[in-house]
Amino acid sequence: MFQINCLNPISKVGLDRLTADYKVTDNMNDAEGVLVRSASMHELELPENLLAVARAGAGVNNIPLDKCAEKGIVVFNTPGANANGVKELVIAGMLLAARDVVGGIEWVKASKDNADIAKAAEKEKKKFAGTEVMGKKLGVIGLGAIGVKVANTAVSLGMEVYGYDPYVSVNAAWNLSRSVKHVTNVEEIYADCDYITIHVPLLDSTKGMINKEAISKMKDGVVLLNFARDLLANEADVLAALKSGKVARYVSDFPNPTTAGQPGCIVIPHLGASTEESEDNCAKMAVEEMMDYLENGNIRNSVNYPACDMGVCSQAGRIAIFHKNIANMLNQFTAVIGEKNINISDMTNKSRGEVAYTMLDIENAATQDLVESLQKIDGVFRVRVVK
């Protein structure tokens, strides 16, 4: 029986995927698996029995990845599960920036007691007139699951779309419309595009990437959209550019005191993935990834350990070893197992940066003596008996 703790409310559609071998517990200290959305785990004590953390969403800056890796705790996320929900809001944000619908709605609210509101509207509506997006140039920075969907939809709206991503995956490239023009220098997007939307992860290299220097290279009157991470934009620089007219609109899904209520800012209360469909998709994907790992040791969509899949174990035992990515580890593992007179029927070893993951199918059930012997090897973080 595996126990699962939910640090945030998780969609029932996802939790319903759990079989009778699972129990949801309110006590994290009893859990082998944790499901989380936005709750911060950085200050939490991670119990020794915790095996996996699954984030129902893409961003994982609320999870201590290195700490988990050192403890042999696999962290999963759900890339692409909420992509359509975010894409739709990005398109909505772009349309709201093109036409002052928000301002018009506020005028209607303020004029609700005017008996001649319809007549007044005909006079006032020119204040809220805008432009169409058809024929305009959109630059998409980051061609992951969301960026690709935004680019493809913008093409269908008649926009001229430019995409930039030096690390674009093969899968993303296959899904990208042929009408999207791929550029190799982000400054081409800065110089040419009327709208710029960013869809990159928050890293040291991307933090504050939309700053005074970048904005100075953009077209006058550019519209900036940020539905990825709040810290990707230096919002003080963005506000200065709004005041000067260099930036026409800044659309963000991340409310904060800097931009809330500021002229030219359209700030949405983090609704990108807040659809029933997105929450259901993320929950299902997170639960399925966690179940496959807990039951079989397979790793899919982890952000701190390499992908690894050996299917369902057909042998008497399966062992998973978390260790440093250094030389001679495999030789030591096989030597210890051989000394116990146990035959290895299948094995795989994968690495990611400074850590590695080894799974071994053995023809005898793993004993406590074997586990302790493997655990004593220098460089091993954790030994887990999967079966």
Can you name each region flagged by the protein language model?
Residues M1-T78, N211-E213, V223, N234, ...:
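An N-terminal-biased, well-structured beta-alpha scaffold segment characteristic
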Residues H42-L44, P166-A260, S274:
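Rossmann-like adenosine-cofactor binding region
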Residues L143-G144:
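Glycine-rich Rossmann-fold phosphate-binding loop(s) that bind the pyrophosphate
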Residues K87-E106, A154-M159, M285-N298, T334-G338:
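Oxidoreductase and adenylate-handling cofactor-binding alpha/beta cores
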